[in-house]
Amino acid sequence: MLKSFLSAVLCLLLAVPVAQAAEANPEQLLASLKFQQGKITLPGDIATLDLPANFRYLPPADAGRLLSEGWGNPPGFETLGMIVPAAVNPLSREGWGVVVTYEKQGHVKDDEADSMKYDELLKTMQEAMAEGNAERKKQGYQPMTLVGWAEAPHYDKANHKLYWAKELHGEGDTQNGLNYNIRVLGREGVLVLNAVAGMDQIGQIRNEMKAVTAFSDFTAGNRYADFNERTDKVAEYGIAALIAGGAAAKLGLFGKLFALLLAFKKVIIVGAGAAVMAIGKLFGRKSKVDLTKSP
């Protein structure tokens, strides 16, 4: 069931035409971005980022400009902002960032975390990706392979934070891509932190993401422990669906970001949950550049 659902969603994603992003002067773009430091309250007062000196934050408008004008995505994708390292130019080859979003789809129960069979889940995800390659080719995209876990899923039950990373390979590519994911479970939804980088940066990203999780937290009243079973909605999916890449199949949602790396561009693709609501905002590029890291 999960495999068929994933395959169907992959076909949906690939069937949507996407726009080309406008090119921008890198120096002018970088100078115009309004980086922030210190303690940041995210839009909607849903969560905070207590940034150390080696990280900076871009508010939603500037994050959107970096994603579109700097990294080659069509404009219009809504985020809560981005976290970027202070010492690295985000427009350079070494540049990377963490896209922050929030999914208010209900309180995710973590009862299954201790009993999850992640090897079986990986196999299902690999099979789903392989089945989607026929449609990828049909739409003009290169076939993709989910190589395996770059970091096996693990759940911090005390802090309600889920971590995992996937290694992805695009046919003909010399470098594999890294999709590093963190989900912070909250009262009514999930804070999504997706790192955009290359597989050769796995050691750095793994260390840096430990810091990112340490300074990211929900505000009072929105934390996991604040859940009220009498008044709050429970999500119709659990830990496995978060890792597989989507919300409950019965809801028809996919709701995840796929972090991608192009040769010199970083591209974000939204999942079918957002596609159902705003199908024209799918992120990706088909002919102008080589799509290298997309589930």
List the predicted regions and their residue ranges.
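Positively charged n-region of N-terminal signal peptides that target proteins for export
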Residues: 1-4
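Bacterial N-terminal signal peptides
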Residues: 7-17
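Intrinsically disordered, low-complexity linkers and terminal tails enriched in Pro/Gly
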Residues: 16, 20-26, 292
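Conserved polar/disulfide-associated segments of primarily extracytoplasmic proteins
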Residues: 22-48, 61-178, 185, 199, ...
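Extracytoplasmic/secreted envelope proteins and their assembly/folding machinery
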Residues: 52, 122, 126, 206-213
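Short conserved aromatic/hydrophobic patches within beta-strands of well-structured domains
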Residues: 53-59, 215-217
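Extracytoplasmic/lumenal ectodomains and periplasmic regions of secretory and membrane proteins
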Residues: 167-235
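C-terminal single-pass membrane-anchor helix
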Residues: 235-295
